[in-house]
Amino acid sequence: MIKVFKDLKFLILITIILLNLKSINCKIIYGDSVSFERVLSPQLGKNITLPWGKDKVIHLCNPHGEESIPVLVSNNIPLGKLASNDENFLAIFGNQSFARLLAHFNCKKTEETCIRLRTDLPVFTSCLLIGSVDGFDHVTFNSSLSGVPTNMNSWNVDTVGKFSNNLTSAGRIIVKNDNNQISLGCFEEGDKNNLNYILMHPNNPIDTIDICYKSFNEESEYVLYGLVECGDTSKSSFSISGYVFFDKYYSSSRINNPPVAGQIVYIQQKNGVVYDLDGKRVNQTITDARGFYYFNNIPGGDYQVYITPSDPDTLYSPDVDSNLQDPYTNKATNGSIETYIYINGSGVVPVSKTNFDDIKLTSVYVIREMNIGILPKNISMEGLVFIDYNANGQMDTAVTNTSAQDKPYSGVRVQLLDENRVVRDVITGDDGIFSFPDVPYVSTGYIAVIYTPSGNVMTNYPFPPSPLAGEIINLEIVPNNILLVGLINNENYCQDSPLMAIICYANQGYNESHADDPVLITFPSNANKHLYNMPHGTVQHIATHKEIGSVYGVGVDRVNGDIYTSAFMKYYSGFGPSGTGAIYKSTTKNNDYQTSLYFDLNKAMNQEDYCGTDSHIYPMDNYDGGVEKVGKIAFGDLDIHNGSLYTIALATKELLRVSISDPRDFQLYNIYNPCIEEPDDWRPFALGLRHGNIIIGGVCSKESDSTNIPVGYIMEMSGNILLTVPMDFPRGCKSFGGSFCIPGEYSAWSSVYFESQPWISDLTMDGEDMIISIRDRGGDLDRDVGTYDMLRACFDGDQLILENSGICGGVPGAHLLPSGYFGTPDGINSGEYYNDNFYYPTDNDGHDNVASTSGVVIPGYHTLFGSSLDIDSVGQGTVKVWDNKNGLLLYGIGVYLQSNENPTNNFGKANGLGDMEPICYNYIK
């Protein structure tokens, strides 16, 4: 049965009639007892209404009229005294001071008299106490609901006991029952001062109890009655569950409507307090992400379950399923529902562990789908546009060293449409959020129109395939559910954990004893061990020394993963078979890489020394020549952009562009020379990509005037200088030991290999900020130590500004001044943003500058991968990983380790690694 309250304006109440049960004794718990204090007359005339707890009443009357009038009087027995200290008896009345009882008198040989106890509403769990049944007393009673007699065999005996633990035992009460009534009697003599009692309860709801009494002995001419709230925890454990939902479609059903998550749901009785069957107070719970709530392990009866929306003008679902015809419908209207819960009651079913909603319930029975539908008067909707770097359709925000962290996409235009009407028009901010607050609710719903930026596609489009790149996207948007829009273009995309391609230099000529040494290799970017300690096959040998010789620049074609490398002049490592003008291509065929000549600038220009003359000395047994040509012939860095390969022809100081699809389509561009006073000293080498445009880095080497220190420049192809990089900052110790420090300050370019000679070798963007890798040319002039620098330049909204004192863009780095290992000044104004020190405790020595000669920021990563040396051993080629957020050195991946038995197996500390690039593929084909 469900009754709808209509006098509550703002609360949604589900009223489930139960009891306020406060104390536990074995498997029975007890609540309020009926107060008989108003029964003062020895004779009962008309009905008397008596209070039962705070909010219920019970009516006491004579069922037989004037012809048989019972004699009754209130009897409040003090608890805890000698005559009333039995613990089970005390538990029935909880922490009350008195046992509230009614005395019913009957003289020997007098006709029996009867009383009737009647409630206005059904009572679900109540216990009837009858005491002082002795000396041949005879008591009978029966019950009914709405005039229909109860099967009295359904009543349970809970306790047969006595009032006192200290007095002599009372007589034993005999119980006899059939379908129509229960009879009580006593045929034993006991201590008249120690009263006996029996406590019973019905298993079905009742509203009337008739009790009749007759005495057969003048020594016992009264019995006592008590009525108390109670519950049988072994048979009457219930749960209430349901959903709170936004009734967006006015359907009064939670199906296809969004849930209300995080909503506090309250439960109470009319007197305001609820206890579960473990005696714990229960008053509220919170809906989960599905809008689901439940109250577990409570006794059957009458409750109120409600929510209090923050908006007092909240409207509710228009229809109510008062007969529980549809399990998914709204069960509340005008603020409340009333339902009775008991075994076999309407909607009450056994708990089923195969039902997902019942999994956490410990009760025996449950009434499910007590659903509450809310109609939003004005609704607000919002969404988030983000850069989905790995295109997995999810916004990944977890910070790890080897995965992308998706970022908000600002500047995206979004419109809100009601059918064809534009309701709002907004632009996403720095947080990527677009919001439409306080728009009228419409039953047809709204559409968010995403004006996709050029070149981008949506990665989580709900109905694949997604619209083409740059096309407008229409998406359904609903309240209380953030619409996530993942966008990606090819430039920003990279699959999870891509392979990394890197150059490892081999000794001697390409056709000499190290011809088969690997030069171009790939390894997993998420490697957690040194490569030489990883299982066979983890590192792939793509091209050998005999195939490509000495190369530096590496470029990866995102379309198919082909890798391009360009010739490089390095001491004791000869050019490949096609000489100084060669660009090689390594491609996968039948799961195997094959390498061939892709482009020869010397041949293309019909001039065999256009890229410089090979100045190596062959055979290259113990000596090599031509060191003065390092950085001046062959090629520099290499990048691929928009279907073309770019590199720098060092001999002519030109930018070379070659079409990937047709190498006959190539072009040479003059590069602006910023070295006004000594134009011959201009040494461009590095390339990068900023805002979709090629940028170039180089140094004025000062080799024409060795008294000065080189200066670096970063510029656009147009010659617009983005950044000037003075190289006169302190650099700590190039090498240090127990008591020595070899100064690391930069010098002008020369043929003196042990001097540190700055060479801007790579440009890497981290968002709007730039990372400048500075290779030590001295490490390529001989087999001696090369020590590298790495500078960060932060964009202030107008220009790039170099780090200073280890701080960039207001963010402190890892090496504030002084940053040298022994406290020596190191870096611009004596501090460095990135920690590039190395200390080897075994030998008590190290270097203050072993940073990166080539830097990689995989799209979306917060880390910088750099080709470097020495992470935990001496003479070790290493890929180091730094945190771009704070400059901390996180870890290193050893690529090679110099062998004491065979020191010529690699270049050790002498610039043994070259360029490095991730193998990222295009997402948009």
From Swiss-Prot:
SUPFAM superfamilies: Hypothetical protein PA1324. Glycans are attached at N47, N95, N142, N166, N283, N334, N344, N378, N401, N511, N642. The keyword Signal applies. GO terms for cellular component: extracellular region. The keyword Transmembrane helix does not apply. Keywords: Glycoprotein, Secreted, Signal. It is found in: Secreted. Residues 1-26 form the signal peptide. It comes from Dictyostelium discoideum. The gene is colD. This is Colossin-D. Belongs to the serine-aspartate repeat-containing protein (SDr) family. Its main location: secreted.
